[in-house]
Structure formats: C-alpha cells, structure tokens
UniProtKB/Swiss-Prot annotation:
Organism: Arabidopsis thaliana (Mouse-ear cress)
Location of the region described as Disordered in the Swiss-Prot/TrEMBL record: 421-451
Induction: By salt stress.
Transmembrane segments: none
Stated name of the protein: Zinc finger CCCH domain-containing protein 47
Start-end of each ANK repeat: 72-102, 107-139
C-alpha cells in the first residue's frame, strides 16, 4: 500500500518536469521563428499545437542599455520587435493575445524598449505598429529609463533621418506624414558588416571637432586589425577612396585638381590642388565656411558644412577662405610685430662706405643725404638670413653715422690748424691728387666679424691713414728756398711694400711719426733720428672702428680733442725750430 502512493507521487512529479521542459522547448521554438521572421512556421506552431503567444522564455541576447550578454526572459513579441520581424510582429498584434505593455525579466523591459535597443532596419515600422496597438511611450524599466532614454544611447548607429523620425515617434507627436517622408527619403546602404558598438562615433567627442576633421580625419591610418565598416571609422584604410593628404605636411589648396578628375594626377602627393571631395571640402580654408541647407536635419554621415550660424568659421574677405587660427594671430594686434612685417620682400641694401662708387668722405656733400635715406633699419628677412645678422646690420647704421660725424669734425679741425702751412698751390693740388689715390675705389663688403664690425670701419682707417700720410708730406713745403727741392717719388705715397694695405702696422706708424716731425732736410740727412716713442700716442685712429655707444671709452670726447691739439702744437714748435 505504501508503494502505491509513492509510485503515483513520483510519476506525477516526473510528468510535471517533462511537461515544463517540453513547454520551454516549444517557447524557445517560437522565439526562434520570431527572430527569423518565419511567419509560416510560427503560425503552424501556434495553430496546430495551440501555444500561448504571451508565454515568455529564456533568450540569449544583449541586455538593454548594456553591453553584457546573457540569458534574459523574453516573449515572442519582444524578440520580434528587437530583430525587426515585421511579419511575425503584425501577426501577434493582430491576434490580440499578447500584451504590448508587458514587462518581464529582471530588467522589466517592454516590447518598445526592445524595439529601440535592437536598432533594426525596420525599427520605425515596428515602433509604429506597437504605438498603434496602444504601447506606452512613457513606460519605464527597472533602471528608470524610458524608451527614448534607451534610444539616445544607441542613436549613433542610426542614420539622421531615421533618428529624427524615431525621436518624434517616442515623444508622442503627430508625425504620420513626417515618418513616411523620412522613410522614403532614406538612402539605404547595404553593408556586409553588422553594427559594431566598439567603433567610436565619428560625430561625437573629439572625432567630431573641427581640429580633428581638418587635420586628422581620414589622414591617420587605422590600427584595427579586424574587418569593420570603413564608413563608420574616422581613420584611413589601405585602398580607401576617402584618403586625404595631411594639409600640414603637403601644401595643397582647396581647389579641385583638374587632372585628378580625369582619372589620375601625374604629380601625385606633390600636387598643389585637392584630390577628391574630402581633400577639397575638409581643407582648413573651406571647412564649415558655408551653412548647410538641411541645418540640424542633415542626413549626411560626414557633413562639410556648418549646421548653425554659430558653427561657421570666419572667412577672410580678401581671399575668400577661412581664417587660420594660429598662435601667431595675436601678434596682429601689436604694431610692429605683425607676421606681415616678417614676410616683406623689400629689404634695405647693405650700407657701404662707398655708395654708388663715391667715397664716404666728410667732404662729400652727398654723403649726408645718402645716410639720411638709409636711416630706416632694414626689414628682418627670415628666409634669406638670420635675425642676428639683420640686427647687427641695423645697429651698424647708427655706428657709421656717428663715426662719419666724428670724422667730419676731426677733419675740419686738422685743416684749420695746418691749412696756413701750405704755401704752394701746385703742391696742394698734387697732394690732393695723391690723396685721392689712397681712397678705396671699390671696397668689398665683408661679413661681420666676430666683434660685429664691418668693412666700413676698415675704410675709415684707410681714410685716416691717407690723411696722415698726406699731412706728413706737407713738411716738404717748409724746406728753405735756397735748397733744391728733392725729387718727388710717387711710390713713397703708398704703402712701404707697394701693396694696398687696409690696416696700420707698428712699423708704418713709426715711419709716419718721423715724417710728421718735420725733421726732413733732404734725402742725405745724417742727423740721428730721435726716438719718438715718448711722443703723444696716435692710436686714437683705432678707436674709429670701435663701438660708439660708450662715451668714456669708444667716442671722440674732449680728451681726444685735447690730445690732438697738444700734438699739433708740438709739431708747430718743432717746425719753428727747424726753420730757425
């Protein structure tokens, strides 16, 4: 007797487990047919076996609003809405045996949540069918998200016309005509790649910024090693037609290349024109300089135009291209520091002591006018030379100006002091001719030395040397008339070795001192030469080549003038003693 009841109990439990497993298998079969949109098989299972259309089962899928995969509780209506099975969905709704607002599973999602989370091709039609069946657009899941909130997270996988239509549908507005228009105008692109959630949105974040679009979009190579949709990737791939050259590396313009339109350009990457639509419209000179005709309703995946007037980039009125934003743009507000000043092609020629072949003598009347015309410092040339050389040249102008003024004043004082000693007009003219021979005819402009001085200083030394030599020869005019004049030797007027010298050595300076002493009584003078090492120093000539910025050491001050006057007075005394 005990065995009987126990046997009946075991058999009932076994029957219940078998029936439940069979029921789960039948439900799983319905879910499979709903996902594949196999209406005939789905109807056969429902009509012949009498399966419940509102029965839920476990379905392996992605959780709504998450990237995690797992077994979730779903009804055939939810699966049909998720995969866009419009035939099965319409059949289920037409029977009226399934609740369109039923929430099941741990997520407590509805068929409308599943429809927007699936992002299927027929998503708009599925949502429209559910809304016609009185589906609630404000229903919330376990996380408090409405269908519209779920769609915002996955909208980057939807094209713009469909996205706008879905948003209007989920907001509950009267959008019947707008939905039909959006569906008709939608450009359906058949892609062999499924939607990849790992790809970043090319219109969001840094990928949608103007800086990335102009200089990095379809320029940098993609680092993904697997096959994916190139149209959804912001980087360039081997063999892609949307490839662009880096505008910072290749100086091309936004003007389309006529040779590239014909098929291929022989210049390749070195061409100065844009190759393709992307290079032309994404060029920094043209990107977002015009307003898009569709504005915020633009359906382009990558748009080259601004959707708002605030997004438009400024355009240069003279060139018609966009104004480049660079760190040097702030210099335009500062006078004298504008980048245009550095790019000037007009430069001042180097200042030379010989302007147009005329020696820069203090007696030259046009010297001052030539100097006034070159007072303006030359423009800095970044292309031809360095800034340091240009700066030194500009500084040397002021130094040469002051040097010439000093030379003019000194020359007048010497002539006033010794002008009365010249008694022979013929010898004066001969002396003037010989002095002109010592002027450099065509001095070569030397580059600045390590001290920053140029050949103009050397020319000044040569001029002073010639004057000193000519002044020494004036002693011949003081020879007594009873004695025969010595034969003039023109070679003695030059350097001792017969070569043109630009500097003054110690031996030549000592000879000049002996000639200036007026102790010459002829070529047969046997008097012992005096040692003139104690004579006043004439090294003031070297100061002409020094910088004139420091008054105490580098300028012709009162001390130099007093020394010159004392030297002239001593020569006058020696002359009187010689005559007597």
């Amino acid at each position: 007797m005990c065995s009987g009841p126990k046997s009946n109990l075991c058999s009932s439990r076994t029957l219940t487990e078998i029936e439940s497993r069979q029921k789960e298998e039948e439900t799983m079969l319905l879910l499979e047919f709903a996902a594949c949109d196999d209406l005939d098989s789905f109807k056969r299972e429902v009509e012949e076996k009498g399966l419940d259309l509102d029965e839920s089962g476990l379905w392996y899928c992605r959780r709504v609003g998450s990237k995690k995969m797992g077994l979730e509780e779903r009804t055939p209506l939810m699966v049909a809405a998720m995969y866009g099975s419009i035939k099965v969905l319409t059949f289920i709704v037409s029977t009226g045996k399934s609740d369109v607002n039923r929430a099941c599973g741990e997520e407590r999602v509805t068929p409308l949540h599943c429809a927007v989370a699936g992002c299927s091709v027929n998503m708009i039609e599925v949502i429209n069918v559910l809304l016609d069946a009185s589906a609630l657009v404000n229903s919330v899941d376990a996380n408090g998200n409405q269908p519209l909130d779920v769609f915002v997270r996955v909208s980057r996988f939807v094209a713009s016309p469909r996205r706008k239509a879905v948003e209007l549908l989920l907001r509950g507005g009267g959008v019947g005509g707008l939905i039909d228009e959006a569906v008709e105008e939608e450009i359906k692109i058949v892609s062999k790649y499924p939607a990849d959630a790992s790809l970043p949105d090319i219109n969001e974040g840094v990928y949608g910024s103007d800086e990335f679009r102009m200089y990095s979009f379809k320029v940098k190579p993609c680092s993904r090693a697997y096959s994916h949709d190139w149209t959804e990737c912001a980087f360039v791939h081997p063999g892609e037609n949307a490839r662009r050259r880096d505008p910072r590396k290749y100086p091309y313009t936004c003007v389309p290349c006529p040779e590239f339109r014909k098929g291929s350009c022989p210049k390749g990457d070195s061409c100065e024109y844009a190759h393709g639509v992307f290079e032309s419209w994404l060029h920094p000179a043209q990107y977002k300089t015009r307003l898009c005709k569709d504005e915020t309703g633009c359906a382009r995946k990558v748009c080259f135009f601004a959707h708002k007037r605030e997004e438009m980039r400024p355009v240069n009125a003279s060139t018609g291209s966009a104004v480049a934003q660079s760190p040097f743009s702030s210099l335009e507000m500062m006078p004298g520091l504008s980048p245009l000043a550095y790019s000037s092609g007009v430069s001042t020629p180097p200042v030379s002591p010989m302007a147009n072949g005329v020696p820069s003598s203090p007696r030259n009347g046009g010297s001052w006018q030539n100097r006034v015309n070159t007072l303006t410092p030359p423009a800095l040339q970044l292309n031809g030379g360095s800034r340091l050389k240009s700066t030194l040249s500009a500084r040397d102008i002021d130094m040469e100006m002051e040097m010439e003024l000093r030379l003019r004043g000194f020359g007048n004082n010497v002539e006033e002091t010794f002008g009365s000693y010249v008694s022979s007009p013929s010898r004066n003219s001969q002396m003037g001719q010989n002095m002109n021979q010592h002027y450099p005819s065509s001095p070569v402009r030397q580059p600045p030395s390590q001290h920053g001085f140029e050949s103009s200083a050397a020319a000044a030394v040569a001029v002073m040397k010639a004057r000193s030599t000519a002044f020494a020869k004036r002693s011949l005019s003081f020879k007594p008339a009873t004695q025969a004049a010595p034969q003039s030797n023109l070679s003695d007027w030059g350097s001792p070795n017969g070569k043109l010298e630009w500097g003054m050595k110690g031996e030549e300076l000592n000879k000049m001192r002996r000639s200036v002493s007026f102790g010459i009584h002829g070529n047969n003078n046997n008097n012992a030469a005096r040692d003139y090492r104690d004579e006043p120093d004439v090294s003031w000539v070297n100061s002409l080549v020094k910088d004139s910025t420091v008054v105490s050491e580098r300028s012709f001050g009162m001390n130099e003038r007093v020394r010159i006057m004392s030297w002239a007075e001593q020569m006058y005394r020696e002359k009187e003693q010689t005559v007597v």
